[in-house]
Regions:
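Substrate-recognition "cap/lid" segment bordering the active-site pocket of phosphatases
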Residues: 7, 228-250, 260-262, 266-327, ...
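Structural recognition of alpha->loop->beta junctions
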Residues: 84-85, 281-297, 363-387
Length: 395
């Protein structure tokens, strides 16, 4: 698709693009569903830092060697998300940690295998990490030189290029394939995967460390009912800011003629509500789908339903009742893929990609254009103006 096939509009925040062959359907929109992170809320100083800090913390404890918090850069995080399989930031931490440990010298992996077996799997995640940290103190000091770190970053970027929209599963499959000639690696991989246990807060190393650093002590205890053990101060969530302006949500409600605004997000409900505050009341309560809702459905249906699976989008749309057409607004390739899959099931879905609050704005704009997204906006705040330009009027 060439740029000539788009209607281009200029706004203060940047350029907007509308596919000309979608305009008639956009005019019929009577429901709008939003992703949360990067769309309603600016997360650039929260989630991305939580990923790099969590990975560095876990790796330091599990190897006995300090890892710089800035080693896993915004570029690396962007590459993970660009695969379409890492909307869940816990999965990004998993990918970083598993790959890094797979690159460790064989002697370190051998020690680590023994330490994990000694630590077992019954104690709390932080207790298990500290046990392994203490195990390293019993042996010769572990050393990793600057060359290891520089090669690690390069090799990690190359590894991410072979990952796909299956996310964590593609991490496991590709690591096992890369090390298929190593007789000990499969046992190491299985043991490590069980040790990290990437799902449940209070049992999972990754989830527990991440949420403590992200939420901070007070919010972590309030949400999960677990006493914090590694972060006794404020969390990175305090760095978040609202992108969406209340007046623009009001404009959309007026244009639609009813409160047909929903959320389909991989965020945790309580952390999203913490930042959205009273704005959450502007959304249809029947059309709010967060990570906990998807996880509950996965347990019930016994199959993976996280993005880019269209479950959360279609579930949120159900809350609107009968609609002619809906717009889903996201900021990642995973969102675009999810909307495309939802459109395969129902032709009513239009995708709008927003790029202003992504890590690399120009790169995300280029990707959205290459993917032939229906609408491309700098931010969600331009949408009311676009709908009005196309003939929609406030009620």
């Amino acid at each position: 698709m060439t740029l000539k096939e788009y209607l281009k509009l200029n706004f203060e925040n940047g350029e907007a693009y509308i596919r000309r062959d979608r305009i008639s359907q956009i005019k019929e929109v009577d429901g709008i569903i939003f992703d949360c992170d990067g769309v309603l809320i600016d997360i650039r100083e929260s989630y991305n830092k939580a990923i790099s800090k969590s990975a560095a913390y876990i790796l330091e404890k599990i190897t006995g060697f300090p890892f710089p918090e800035d080693l896993f850069s915004n570029e690396i995080i962007h590459l993970f998300r660009a695969t379409g399989g890492f909307n869940d930031d816990w999965d990004t931490v998993y990918g970083i940690v598993m790959f890094t440990l797979s690159k460790m010298p064989s002697e370190i992996r051998k020690h680590l295998t023994t330490f994990i077996e000694e630590a077992g799997f019954k104690n709390s995640p932080i207790s298990r990490l500290r046990f392994i940290e203490n195990c390293w103190k019993r042996i010769e000091a572990n050393t990793l030189d600057a060359r290891f770190f520089s090669e690690l970053v390069k090799d990690l970027k190359d590894f991410i290029k072979i990952l796909d929209s299956t996310g964590r599963r593609s991490v496991d499959e590709n690591l096992l394939k890369i090390h298929e000639q190593d007789a000990d690696f499969q046992h190491f991989h299985t043991l490590l995967k069980r040790f990290l246990n990437s799902k449940e807060i209070g049992r999972s190393v990754i989830a527990t460390v991440f949420e403590e650093l992200f939420c901070g002590a007070r919010l972590f205890k309030e949400i999960y009912g677990i006493n914090p053990r590694i972060n006794m101060g404020p969390g990175l969530i305090e760095n978040e800011r609202l992108i969406v302006k209340p007046k623009h949500l009001d404009s959309l409600i007026s244009i639609l003629g009813r409160k047909n605004l929903g959320i389909a997000s991989g965020s945790r409900r309580r952390s999203a509500e913490y930042i959205l505050g009273e704005l959450i009341k502007k959304f249809n309560p029947k059309s709010l789908v967060f990570a906990e809702d998807v996880e509950a459905a996965e347990r019930l249906l016994k199959k993976p339903l996280k993005k880019p699976h269209p479950y959360s989008l279609l579930k949120a749309a159900e809350g609107f009742g009968k609609v002619r057409s809906i717009i889903y607004i996201g900021d990642s390739m995973e969102d675009a893929i999810m909307a495309s899959r939802a459109r395969d099931e129902t032709r009513r879905v239009i995708f709008a990609g927003v790029y202003r609050y992504t890590i690399f704005e120009e790169e995300m704009l280029r990707i959205f254009l290459k993917y032939r997204c229906d609408i491309i906006l700098p931010t969600v705040n331009e949408l009311p103006s676009i709908l009005e330009m196309l003939g929609r009027r406030k009620n």
